[in-house]
Each structure stands twice: as C-alpha cells, then as structure tokens.
Amino acid sequence: MAYKAEHNKYRELWKRDNGPMIGKWDIDYSYYSPVDYGADKKKKYPLCIVLVGALEGAFEGLEIQANEMPVWCDEKYQSRFYNGGSYLMIPRAPEEDGIYWDQSCLVDSLKAAIVDFCDKHENVDKSRIYLLGWCLGSLGAMNLASAYPELFAATVLMAPDRAITKSEAERLREMPVWLMAAKTDTHSFYHFNALPTWKLLCSTTNNKLNLRLTTYLRAVDVYLVHNAVAMCNHNLWDNVSEDLHFEGVPYDRDKIISGSYKGMKTVDGTGAVLYDPHIISWLSKFTNDGRSAIRTPALNKTVSEKAYIRFNEDFMHEAHQKIFAVLGVIYRKLGWL
C-alpha cells in the first residue's frame, strides 16, 4: 500500500514525548491518547507499542510518517480494543547515532520509556501492554519481550531479520506470539528466520493456542530511497495497519487479499488453520496477569505443523525459495541490499 496522504488527519492527532535518560539514550516517541479525544476517563485502556523498521527513525516524527499505523487511532480500530480504545506509542530508535532497534543496548532505555509513559498516563491498563515490531523492529521486540516478559501481554513479530534464539523462546514460553512472514521475502528469508523461529516457539510454549503464524506468498515490496534497492515481499505491516481487513476485505477462501497481498494463511501452534484472523481482537484476549486463549474456528480441517510449514506446491516449489536465498547473499555481498 502506498503512502496515504489522507491518513495525515490521523497523524495530526499524535503527540510527542520522550523517556528518561538511561545510559546514553532517552527514547523519544510519538503517541496517541484516547482520553484526549473523548474516551471515558474512568476506564483503563490497553497500550500498543510499535517498533518500526530501519530508516523509519531517521529523524523525529518520521516514525509515524513512514507507515500507516497511525490510522489505528481511527474510531473503527479503536472500537475493536478492550474498553473501546487504546493508547498507541511508536518509539524512535536513535538512528542518527547509527543505532537501530536490533541492538540490545536500547533495551533498558526503551523499557524505561514505556514505564515512564504508563506513569504519565494513568488510564493505561498495565495488564494489557502489547508489543509489535517489523523488520529490525521485530528484533527489538524480541530483545525487549524476552528481557522483560512480565511487562507484556502479547507480541506480534513481522518479517524478523533473524531467528529467535532458544533462550529467548524459552523466556517467551508463556507469552502469546503472532509471527508473520512472506515465504518469498528477499530480505528476511523465511527458511533462515521465520521458520526456525516458529519451530522454537512451538517447542517451548506453554500453550500452543496462544501462538499464530501468518505466511504470505506475495506481499508489498520495499524500496530504499537512498539506493533504490527493492526488498521484495517484505512489507507485511501495511496489512496489519488494516487489522488484516485491508479496506474492509478480509482474508478469503480463495487465498487472495485485496491489493498486493496474496496467499495469506494463518495457523495456530497446533497446526489448525484459522479463518478470518484479525490482530486487534487477538491482542485484546490477553493480559499479562492471566494469559488465556479462545480457539478460533478452524477452516476446513486441522493440519499438522510439519505439513503446513512446507511450501504449497500449487504456488511455489521449495527450490525457488533457496534460489531467492542464494541471490540475497550475492546481492548483499555486492552491496545491493
């Protein structure tokens, strides 16, 4: 999905602040407060934290200009959250210092910014803090969630740039995790990153119903402005910004998503195929003091994890993915990625 200028009306509702200085950094961020726009001040509301990808934090404010997540302050999305609203927070990595979300040196500074935000906004429901991230931001989410699992109720990892480690997966064994990846992503390779992550999560979790894996055969390409290099099928977050409805058109039985998203399929940790999955309703089921899950009706029949994670031969043979992997290594050595 291209940048939507009409979403600027939502960006104008966001404010800026920063957390306390921890070590070398005080993390600045953009945020939306539902109580500033009519939400009942007697209620508590979830907090959704989104860690964006590299280059989206190049300067202050870009973190809400470079993607469409600010649209979640629209009433149609706010109304889907527990208690009918949610705080939204998009922190910015100090990229001007060459530091990105994948670097563990930011974990304590980011955690301090979140705690400080909750202290400043008394209507935040501290049992419903949700953490989302994509690309390098998903690595920041892995780092933070595994370091402080008690802080978060659930996490969503999109197009991770590396596989989770065994120790990280073990620390997340009680946390609901939704993993998303495109099997044809030429930047974050499915077989190297997402697939091993899924296997480790499934083998360590205390509740497989709390896990979800969404894969695509086609997603949106990403172009790096400074060198015009395409990261094919890498952008999954535009679809997340639409709560997987994508302009009101949900996941359908023909495996087609409106626009560039095709071949979307979602399963839980048991291998059950899930019909019509949506991010916000899934997040809203969880608290960090009483994790639970309600099984979503399966589409057709339950399939095994082993059967699901193989490529669907109707769309693409596994060898094609290996070719993409080899090309990616070559492109990186040539400096094209």
Model-derived features: positions:
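Short alpha-helix in the alpha/beta-hydrolase fold that links the catalytic acid
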Residues: L62-E63, F189-S203
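C-terminal catalytic histidine-bearing segment of alpha/beta-hydrolase fold enzymes
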Residues: M180, T186, F192, S203-Y331
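Active-site machinery of serine-nucleophile hydrolases
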Residues: Y45-L47, L51-S109
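Primarily recognizes the serine-hydrolase "nucleophile elbow" in alpha/beta-hydrolase
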Residues: S127-R171
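Gly/Ser-rich "nucleophile elbow"/oxyanion-hole loop immediately N-terminal to the catalytic nucleophile
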Residues: Y37-K43, G98-C135
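Short, proline-enriched alpha-helix->beta-strand connector loops that line the catalytic pocket
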Residues: G84, R171-V177
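Extracytoplasmic/secreted cell-surface and envelope-processing proteins
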Residues: A58-E60, D97-W101, S138-M142, R162-E168, ...
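A domain-start/cap signature at the N-terminus of enzymes
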Residues: M1-L47, L132-W134, L139, T197, ...
